[in-house]
């Protein structure tokens, strides 16, 4: 089975937290069982018949990209991730949709993203009332953590949008140059990024 055959789980009619948790866990388990452990998913623009350098490990935990409803539904249908920062980056978080209300979540998203991108959290809580559940690829880097109810919840952004603490792209480029020139890394960047979407859901949940 390939990513193209994966049917995005539509969980928008699930209104109870307990059922949402179990459905998401089932989707995560099914995704890992049906695909290989390392999944390449984006056809290469420079190597015909091959994939670019972005991949995901299909046995990991889910993270969430929060959006407004119309963008969420279109992205799930077309297997896209939208940008939620001014440099076309995509930020995802381990904070699950049942942990806080839309207004509180919106404040957290504003603290982590600037006023740019297709999804702009500064426009209000309606911008984060739906979610796409995904698994982060190798092009995501973890850039921060929030502690909520004594639990750690991480934030990750696609590589190039932010740097891990202590990381220096200039040094990396110099090292590659001294090594005789490493192969260029190819991955898709833009307002909409082709990406495996595991599930779509609403944050309007009750206990």
Swiss-Prot record:
Acidic residues bias spans: 164-178
Annotated keywords: Crown gall tumor, Plasmid
Residue segments, region Disordered: 161-185
Keyword hit for S-adenosyl-L-methionine: no
Disulphide bond pairs: none
Pfam assignment, any one: RolB_RolC
UniProt keyword Cytoplasm, yes or no: no
InterPro entries in the cross-refs: Glycosidase
Function: Involved in tumor formation and increases auxin and cytokinin effects in host plants.
Protein name: Protein 6b
């Amino acid at each position: 089975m390939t990513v193209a055959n994966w049917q995005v789980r539509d969980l928008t009619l699930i209104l109870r937290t307990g059922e949402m948790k179990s459905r998401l866990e089932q989707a995560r388990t099914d995704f890992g069982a049906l695909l290989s452990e390392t999944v390449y998913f984006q056809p290469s623009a420079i190597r015909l018949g091959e994939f670019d350098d972005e991949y995901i490990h299909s046995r990991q935990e889910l993270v969430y990209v929060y959006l407004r409803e119309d963008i969420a539904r279109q992205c799930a249908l077309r297997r896209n991730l939208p940008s939620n920062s001014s440099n076309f980056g995509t930020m995802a978080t381990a904070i699950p949709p049942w942990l806080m209300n839309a207004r509180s979540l919106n404040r957290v998203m504003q603290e982590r993203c600037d006023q740019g991108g297709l999804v702009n959290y500064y426009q209000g809580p309606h911008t984060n009332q739906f979610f796409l559940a995904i698994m982060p690829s190798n092009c995501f880097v973890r850039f921060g953590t929030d502690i909520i109810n004594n639990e750690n919840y991480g934030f990750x952004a696609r590589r190039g949008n932010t740097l891990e603490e202590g990381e220096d792209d200039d040094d990396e480029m110099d090292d590659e140059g001294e090594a005789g020139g490493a192969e260029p890394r190819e991955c898709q960047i833009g307002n909409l990024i082709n990406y495996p979407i595991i599930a779509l859901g609403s944050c309007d949940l009750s206990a």
